[in-house]
């Protein structure tokens, strides 16, 4: 591990993946990191499946996915990993749903999505899988909400989202699923909505104050954060084209309102298409794209207690468009784009005792 200004954090570098990829689907189950599908050097979706044994730090090849895909969603259900939606070799959204049985090392097909979709957001609650939104073969954003019942191997429809979108950020908090942002075609969505799992009703919350694509979102200590991104031109914006920003907007779930933090509390670097997560009372922003000609390697954290940004140790491998996954005190940053699809697997970790 390496340390720097952020003494509470360090990077752990794992052996590189056998297959370089971007838009891979990742899951963590029983101390194994699974990386499924994605796009390789040729730019086409892969059926390749690999797993990293966290104890031995060795990679193993798994049985290939029945359906090659990129940008799929994954949910862990006990000893199974369910893979939902994504895009296929002809750049068309897929309806296929497949489960990898960890103990048996094989794939099984499951009930397909009612409609093919890419950019589906998924949440697991009490053994049920909720799939929200997506983009269909007609490129139109979807408002559908479906719930998968593993025992019956079927999808059931729930009340639709008020705002159709794909690629949204979702957070489970209490008995509600919060859905933030996403896209409609090339346009970023500012909607912020919540689905009550008990009442099965939707609530519209105040929209994001600013319209940004490729922003990073995280939830911590009862607040939702929206960071950075590409700011879109608008009537109160003198820029004629999208530009990188270091904006920080925070929604207080208790008070139900957004706060746009002042310049002194913005991120140190302007960035988009980056990894964001919550570790040990900090919101962390990792890599991405900025005004430089190559991906960023810088990392920073916002201390919720001290209300300030601090520089953290830089990424060992600067990248953007990474897959990410949080498992305990580790935030994994997997694959992505450096000078092409990357094999790098690294994790930002909390030091022991912090």
UniProtKB/Swiss-Prot annotation:
Record's keyword annotation contains Repeat: yes
Principal localisation: cytoplasm
Disulfide bonds: none
A biological process term (GO) from this entry: mitotic nuclear division
Task of the protein: Involved in pinching off the separated nuclei at the cleavage furrow and in cytokinesis. Required for mitotic integrity and maintenance of chromosomal stability. Protects cells against mitotic errors, centrosomal amplification, micronucleus formation and aneuploidy. Plays a key role of midbody function involving abscission of the daughter cells during cytokinesis and appropriate chromosomal and nuclear segregation into the daughter cells.
PANTHER family: KELCH DOMAIN-CONTAINING PROTEIN 8B, RING-TYPE DOMAIN-CONTAINING PROTEIN
Name of the protein: Kelch domain-containing protein 8B
Gene: KLHDC8B
